[in-house]
Regions:
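Hinge/cleft segment of the Venus flytrap/periplasmic-binding protein
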Residues: 1-2, 133, 137-140, 152-153, ...
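Immediate post-signal peptide segment of exported/extracytoplasmic ligand-binding proteins
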Residues: 1-6, 30, 124-127
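Short, low-complexity disordered leader/linker segments with a strong preference
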Residues: 1-5, 58, 80-87, 298
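Hinge/beta->alpha junction and helix N-cap segments in small-molecule ligand-binding domains
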Residues: 9-23, 38-49, 71-72, 94, ...
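Signal peptide-proximal N-terminal region
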Residues: 23-40, 154-156
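Hydrophobic alpha-helical
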Residues: 58, 64-83, 149, 162-163, ...
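Short, hydrophobic alpha-helical segments
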Residues: 58, 120-124, 182, 248, ...
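Flexible loop/hinge segments that line or gate small-molecule binding clefts
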Residues: 72-111, 119-123, 129, 135, ...
Length: 298
């Protein structure tokens, strides 16, 4: 079988990580002889729009769907509708809370949260007042990364965590939230951020306030790599949405072609800092989604 049509869902067009996921899906489709249809809410992370997009996708009768819910609990009925239509689903990035799916593709958000938090705490010498900003409240990635941040902090007696309001995984929101937080918080020794986009907003707020603090992020986006290169950002984690989106799309294609697909595919991550950023120092368009055999063991 060839020429399969895969409906690929992403949450928004404002977070570059989802640009990367779409690029990964497109790369894999091109080399597999499949076709991708993208479904993206016009309003970022909008539940109502995604519900409507699911109905549009079902009506288009794709061979499979690659699906990330904008909210893991609010799309249960939509996933049931996809299941009832007999369309195979590959779940990626945010694990579904209900429904049937061929496989889940992602990374261990809890572990990466623990690891990058410990990296920051070591940098601070094991003590300090650390601000923490989560992303979209309904996103599993944010919830698990924050849980990892907090569990890591419990292992460092000298670390105190100060939680800010969520930055919704948006740079403008994160900048506004951090500016308000800084206005009432005289001491911030470091900042944990659940993604790179928010980290960039946090850095802007710190700089506008004439203050300095080491900041970490997640995603290894080109803008974050540039900030590491210049010394503005301490570190990030290569939670690679391009790889995840690409492998999820390939999982859908392989399933349709009768090939075996693992029930879960968890891709490894690593911390990116001044010592190793060169491997990621290129635009998204010049990055490559690895082959299935490089990442998936059956």
């Amino acid at each position: 079988m060839a020429g399969e049509t895969i409906a690929v869902f992403t949450k928004n067009r404002t977070n570059p990580a989802y640009d990367a996921a779409r690029m990964g899906a497109d790369q894999v489709a091109a080399r597999s002889g499949a076709r991708v249809l993208h479904f993206v809410p016009g309003k970022p992370d909008d539940i109502t729009e995604q519900v409507a997009l699911v109905e549009q996708a079902i009506a288009a009768r794709p061979d499979a769907m690659v699906f990330v819910p904008v909210d893991v609990n609010a799309l249960d009925a939509s996933v049931s509708r996809i299941n009832a239509a007999g369309i195979p689903v590959v779940n990626y990035l945010n694990r579904l809370s209900a429904g049937r799916f061929v496989t889940y593709v992602g990374s261990d958000d809890y572990r990466l949260g623990r690891d990058i938090a410990a990296y920051l705490f070591r940098h601070l010498g094991g003590k300090g007042e650390v601000a923490m900003m989560g992303g979209v409240p309904g996103a599993v990635t944010s919830r698990e990364r924050v849980r990892g941040f907090l569990d890591s902090a419990r292992e460092w007696r000298g670390i105190s965590i100060m939680e800010t309001p969520p930055g919704d995984y948006q740079e403008v929101t994160a900048r506004r939230v951090m500016a308000s937080f800084l206005a009432t918080t005289p001491r911030v020794d470091g900042v944990l951020s659940a993604n790179d986009v928010m980290s960039l907003g946090i850095l802007s707020a710190l700089e506008a306030a004439g203050r300095r603090a080491p900041v970490i992020g997640v995603n290894a986006l080109p803008e974050a790599i540039a900030a590491i290169k210049s010394g503005r950002l301490l570190a990030t984690v290569d939670f690679d949405a391009m790889k995840i989106g690409g492998i999820a799309t390939e999982a859908a294609v392989r399933h349709l072609r009768g090939e075996r697909v693992p029930e879960e595919i968890i891709l490894p991550v690593q911390i990116v800092d001044q010592s190793n950023f060169a491997s990621w120092d290129r635009p998204l368009g010049q990055r490559r989604c690895p082959a299935w055999s490089e990442l998936v063991v059956i």
